[in-house]
Amino acid sequence: MNPSTITNDLTVEILSRLPAKSVARFHCVSKQWGSIFGSPYFKELFLTRSSTKPRLLFAMAEKVNEEKNCVWRFFSTPQLENPYEKSSSTLVAAAEFHVKFSPDKLYICHCYDLKYFSIGYASGLIYLYGDRGEATPLICNPTTGRYAILPNRYTYRKAYSFFGFDPIDKQYKALSIFYPSGPGHSKILTFGAGHMKWRKINCPLRYDRHDIKSEGICINGVLYYLGSTSDCVKDGHGIVSDYVIVCFDIRSEKFTFIDVERFCRLINYKGKLAVIYWEDDVDIYKLYYSDVDEYVEYNINDDDINELRVWVLEDVKKQQWSKYAYTWTDDRFFRRRVSIAGGTASGEIVFSMLKYTPKQPFYVFYFNPERNTLQRVEIQGFGEVLKKTCRVCTFVNHVEDLNVHDFKQLKSVHPPLVDEPDSESD
């Protein structure tokens, strides 16, 4: 075919099938391609195609010194559709390596204690905010390595941070919640809004000083996380439980709260908030054991058949839930090495291992509540890049969205986009 006869529509159709990393690279090939990639039509077409093939995103934190400074590596693998139709007890999926992320002269740290967290995800972007407020806060694209540094969040005390996306105004916001003890103000930052700065934000008096018990998840423009009200003054405030789900509307910047009966895990279940209760689940923040493994060893029986309860929030204002219960054969492997990554669009609950160890298999598990079946999937390919034990954060439903490849917001590029092999002496 003569190149001159290729229509613009056909060019757009062909280019829309490229991976996001290639689109980022080819942006400067020609003015025509740059114009195509930047058009709203192309971005929506690309997003539509990408949304039909969601992926699991793996963020791997490798410690490089004793001060918790680390290198992040990002991988992804196709999110399996109907994994239970295969006959094998263990399926295999290949991980695609995207980028080794450790910009020069930037202190990027990660807390390796399972009780704490230092990374957030929302609509295709990663928010790295360090160990409870330490280090340089930044937002990066895990596919291309482009990033933007945020203003430092100065506080009397350390604070927890969360990351959310408003699909109406197409805005990302970072939320910083201060510790319940001591002075401090919660603050919020709008990403890409001219001169970025942290603004004070007030939490309603009822739960003004709540402790943080989970990572945040953002669903349809609302950020959710689990809080503890044990340090709140309960008299006259109507607080009926030690735990509460904090709901923060990204667009209006308003807080609402949902009381829950005890410690639980939060996931996005078919576009709705859901909480998961294990029969003997425990708030690891309250453990007197220094090691979660020690608690599991002495308190979890391999032969126990527990009840896994899934509550789906149907009406936020009325706080109405659909409640489901499933028998769950628990074991030490799940409690010691696996965390809940989230829920797929078709309703599977995805569990992922917390750590990658060289020369040992790495698994994710798809649990189908309706069928009460569990499918194990071995993820291969990490060992080609990783040579040390790493902490793993897994995110479900990762979709490549060109709207987050905004060259005006993510100005800095972190080359190379391919990893460099470690030397024999490392």
Swiss-Prot record:
F-box domain mapped to chain residues: 1-48
CDD domains reported for this sequence: F-box_AtFBW1-like
Record-linked NCBIfam families: F_box_assoc_1
Name used for this protein in its record: F-box protein At2g15640
